[in-house]
Amino acid sequence: MSSLKDKKIAVLAADGYEQSELESPVEALKSEGATVEIISLKSGEIKAMKGHEWSNSVAVDKTVSEAKESDYDALLLPGGVLNPDAVRVDKDAIKFVKDFFSKNKPVAAICHGPQTLINAEVV
């Protein structure tokens, strides 16, 4: 991976994201110099699932209603079962995703993450 210094990545997730599908990519992005912000449907913290059990929490940097695509260079959509079910029906989340596609910015989706792309009608 080339250096991501000076790049800012949005990670859009909600309660029930699969722990490894958020934590591992975030760690990799940060290790390459990227700034990563967690965007969610609510402020505070969101809770991970590890398999079928609730697990770690992560702090939310901004709500999706506050976040703007123009502040980011790329978007990551982690999977999990509960997470995409919430994100894909949120109107602000759908708009946020569509805005990345309208500007031809990179979007990565893991596991069940592409469900949001389907609801946003970008794939």
Regions found by a protein language model. Name each.
Residues 110-113:
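Short, thiol/selenol-centered motifs that function as redox-active sites or metal-ligating centers
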Residues 1-103, 115-123:
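Extended, subdomain-level signal for the structured scaffold at the beginning of enzyme domains
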